[in-house]
Amino acid sequence: MALVTSFNMANPQPAIEGGISEVEIISQQVDEETKSIAPVQLVNFAYRDLPLAAVDLSTGGSQLLSNLDEEYQREGSDWLKPCCGKRAAVWQVFLLSASLNSFLVACVILVVILLTLELLIDTKLLQFSNAFQFAGVIHWISLVILSVFFSETVLRIVVLGIWDYIENKIEVFDGAVIILSLAPMVASTVANGPRSPWDAISLIIMFRIWRVKRVIDAYVLPVKLEMEMVTQQYEKAKAIQDEQLERLTQICQEQGFEIRQLRAHLAQQDLDLAAEREAALQAPHVLSQPRSRYKVVEAGTWAEETAAESIVEELRPSQEATVKDDMNSYISQYYNGPSSDSGAPEPAVCVVTTAAIDIHQPNVPSDLFSVDLPLKLSGNSTCASATSETTSHSTCGSVTRAQSASSQTLGSSTDCSTPREELLPSKPRSSPLPLLLPPQQLVAEATVQDLMSSLSKDPCPSHKALDPAPLAQPTPLGSVQTSPELEHRVSLFNQKNQEALPVLQINPVIHLQPTAGLEEKFRSLESKEPKLHTVPEA
């Protein structure tokens, strides 16, 4: 059983699927091992240690028989084998039984009483009629009882063995008492008959009264042995429980270590969740930052939308750059290049003063703004037109970039043959404008139409010379040729534009046309100024 237990401890069964814990499995193993422990049998006991109680012959008898045979073979006392053999165990159990010992004690008391009466009759201390006949009957009864005692002693010697019988001092004393009580009675009976005073020597048989102790032991020893067996079982169970306790303690320590690791992991996860929560709380502040109110909205493919958005990003003005919306600064830029205090980028080609009308947002006041529109134009009939919130692509392939101090950036490149309806971003091609519009939007529409009508007089403004001379003081009426200083400035300006953009073949933006009169140019621009700086009342 100990080997089985150690094997179970060395090779623990794996956890059964289905929710049964390892602790329950261990408890079940302990219960099974406790039930499988057989009760302790009365084996390998010496004669003086065996109880006098009734023993189960089916279990204890066969075990005693086998153990006695082994002991006889070991000690070499083989004289009992031919006589009794394996039946000696049955006789041993019978001789050690409590019933036999109780009967023997009763016989001892009876023979003592009979021998005492016989002694009183023989000494004539007790006289009554037929006393001598009664004394003879008592004599023969006492002789029979003493003969039974002698037979029991011989049976003990035969069953237990001469050497075991001699080793047990109490049994030797008991046998001596029986012989000393039986021998004088037999001798007196043979010599003198039943009437002999020597029969009183048989009273020595009263020393067999010690058999009472055997009777008491016959009832006490079974309980004692039973308690000893229970104690042994509990000791074995305690040893098993101690082993299981050590194992469970080890399992608890491992689980405690694992629990500490999991708690540390959960603490780290809590820190990560807290960091993510803080980031999520800061996200609305990032999303709520002000953005540009211009957004490219154009029906087309994804590539076109992406290109338009990239163009709008390029057209957004930098916050650091501050351009003075002044006509004098524009003129100084035409002649001298970008000024140091204007903050405009160097690759600016030209500046066109026009109106930027936010049609999509009617809440914005419809004041006119001056927009710096650096144009990069090629010579294959491309033109620039200022529109709001839209970038349109055309066959010319030119890109217009615009920057403004009012944070409104508009740019478009379109073909010269584009009709007037295509220049309006807020007006779809397939559907007309709604009939009922807000007043501010109507004002914006009217302003844009006026601007487009002024620009549509020349189908391609890029081919017409944009001469800054009318913006200055007018020259005398008869002068057709321009001054050499103005020609020099225009040539420097065109050369700078060509050097700044070496990739594109750019024709000079400003052409000096000697045939056109300066007064006519000034008059045409003067007629458009009220429309640029004032909003007509609708």
UniProtKB/Swiss-Prot annotation:
Signal peptide: none annotated. The keyword Magnesium does not apply. Keywords: Cell membrane, Cell projection, Coiled coil, Disulfide bond, Membrane, Transmembrane, Transmembrane helix. In brain, present in the granule layer of the cerebellar cortex. Localizes on the post-synaptic side of glutamatergic mossy fibers and granule cells in the cerebellum (at protein level). It comes from the Eukaryota. Residues 232-278 form a coiled coil. Residues 381-396, 425-434 have a biased composition (Low complexity). InterPro entries: Ion_trans_dom, TMEM266, Volt_channel_dom_sf. One of its GO terms (biological process) is transmembrane transport. GO terms for molecular function: protein homodimerization activity. Its main location: other. The keyword Membrane applies. It is found in: Cell projection, Dendrite; Perikaryon. GO terms for cellular component: cytosol; dendrite; perikaryon; plasma membrane. Residues 1-102, 152-169, 221-538 are cytoplasmic. Disruption phenotype: TMEM266-deficient mice show no significant difference in rota-rod test and gait analysis but show a significant reduction in stereotypic behaviors. Residues 380-435, 453-483 are annotated as: Disordered. The chain crosses the membrane at residues 103-123, 131-151, 170-190, 200-220. Residues 124-130, 191-199 are extracellular. PANTHER family: TRANSMEMBRANE PROTEIN 266. The transmembrane segment S4 functions as a voltage-sensor and is characterized by a series of positively charged amino acids at every third position. Transplantation of the transmembrane segment S4 into HVCN1, generates a functional voltage-activated proton channel. The coiled coil mediates homodimerization. Voltage-sensor protein present on the post-synaptic side of glutamatergic mossy fibers and granule cells in the cerebellum. Despite the presence of a voltage-sensor segment, does not form a functional ion channel and its precise role remains unclear. Undergoes both rapid and slow structural rearrangements in response to changes in voltage. Contains a zinc-binding site that can regulate the slow conformational transition. This is Transmembrane protein 266. The gene is Tmem266.
